[in-house]
Swiss-Prot record:
Protein purpose: Together with its co-chaperonin GroES, plays an essential role in assisting protein folding. The GroEL-GroES system forms a nano-cage that allows encapsulation of the non-native substrate proteins and provides a physical environment optimized to promote and accelerate protein folding.
Name listed for the protein in its UniProt record: Chaperonin GroEL
InterPro entries noted in UniProt: Cpn60/GroEL (IPR001844), Cpn60/GroEL/TCP-1 (IPR002423), GROEL-like_equatorial_sf (IPR027413), TCP-1-like_intermed_sf (IPR027410)
UniProt entry keywords in alphabetical sequence: ATP-binding, Chaperone, Cytoplasm, Isomerase, Nucleotide-binding, Stress response
Compartment list: Cytoplasm
Transmembrane segments: none
Binding site for ATP: 23-27
EC number from the UniProt entry: 5.6.1.7
Gene: groEL
Pfam families with a match to the protein in the record: Cpn60_TCP1 (PF00118)
Organism encoding this protein: Mycolicibacterium pulveris
Any single GO BP term: protein refolding
Assigned GO CC terms: cytoplasm
Assigned protein family: Belongs to the chaperonin (HSP60) family.
Length: 120
């Protein structure tokens, strides 16, 4: 039963990450698994579960604060293309994404579907 609870927790973490960020599910899953593994190890060694939870919450606050301080706004078409190219691992895809975003604007929606056609 504990394994099922853990699996459900990791699924929820991945889903929430995808809903909020649209990316990062693998990283979130690895982090969740590490938190559960190390948390259980510490509790088994005698750590207070509530103290452990509070420590994790403080660490999350500090990490979030640090990430927000170092975050950079992506505003220009060139910045969007560069960011998208890194994410996609392909300069041409980055350019296409930037072009699509330029056309639909900040409030627009871009839908990507798999195709049986070869090429872009």
């Amino acid at each position: 039963p504990y394994e099922k609870i853990g699996a459900e927790l990791v699924k929820e973490v991945a889903k929430k990450t995808d809903d909020v960020a649209g990316d990062g599910t693998t990283t979130a899953t690895v982090l969740a698994q590490a938190l559960v593994r190390e948390g259980l190890r510490n509790v088994a060694a005698g750590a207070n579960p509530l103290g452990l939870k509070r420590g994790i919450e403080k660490a999350v606050e500090k990490i979030t604060e640090t990430l927000l301080k170092s975050a950079k706004e992506v505003e220009t078409k060139d910045q969007i293309a560069a960011t998208a190219a890194i994410s996609a691992g392909d300069l041409q895809i980055g350019e296409l994404i930037a072009e699509a975003m330029d056309k639909v604007g900040n409030e627009g929606v871009i839908t990507v579907e798999e195709s049986q056609t070869f090429g872009l």
